Amino acid sequence: MTNRFRVSSALIRRLEDVGLRPLVVLRQAGLPMGLFDQEKILVTTEELFSLYRGISEVSRDPAIGLKLGTEERIERYDPISIAALYARSFRDALQRMARYKQLTCPEEIRIAERGDECAVQFLWLLADEIEPALLIDGCFAWIVAIGRRGTGRLVNPKRVELQRTEAHRKMYEQHFQCPVKFGARQNVLVFDKADVERPFVTHNADLLAILAPQLEAQLTQQLAQKSVSEQVKGILKRLLAGQRPGLETVAGELRLSTRTLQRRLTGERATFQQLMEDARRELAQHYLLHSSLELNETAYLLGYEDANSFFRAFHHWEGTSPGEWRASHARSGQIQETETSPV
């Protein structure tokens, strides 16, 4: 996974479409005025957040994030969105978006299923601050737009949960066509599992057979720059969402046999179990610092069968309980239950 975000040139055109001048946005964001002139626009997480705050401040339109995330013109879709649109189903599209997102940024799309619900969440892995509300709006609108266009029907989330304080409820509920909960413990888009299983009328196996191998080759090339242990831990962190992926699952992600993966890990003096523990520990710290999730919910997302198992593991890692660790590491901007509206 890259440590920088690649900003699509399509964003510049979208800004112009909604009446915003890119240079004014850059000035407001405190970013280099020549940023958008680069052939490949790469920014840090901090710069990305500044960019979206700049867009919000210049626009003053509470719906700007929803507009930017809902692209109607397929010719402006990036390769990840096109691959998603050609997928077999909404589920397949979500999985491809999560997998290929690694190519463009240090961000993860996490998909967690529980009962008859499927929750989609975005995690900014290198963030030291709360993500701008406009960015969340755009990401959620993007997911819903792909689902609606792919199925050819008005696929609506079951609910949307937002950490920020309540603002513009009617606007959000009209766009997503579902209840919106403000002051939530996390930003999450929740679908009925039945809707996630819907087939895509836009499915194109022939074109997907051309595009997917190219994306897989890029992903393989990028992952090859890391040790096998780093690759395994990254995959585990992406797949740990209410489940505990096994060696066979991870080997499949790497296009390796389980025996080959075991041999390579042994060569690096690593074990699958230790990498699982490392991934859980790092994710636990991320959840405790950057969300106000209840501890039993955190345990579930880390693949533990019950909260007590998580508490014991965490105490083994840190020598203290999750709640005490969270309290001792809390500082301004790190942990907060609500986020102010961008407009």
Regions found by a protein language model. Give the residues of each.
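Short, conserved glycine- and acidic-residue-centered signature motifs
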Residues: 44, 136-139, 277
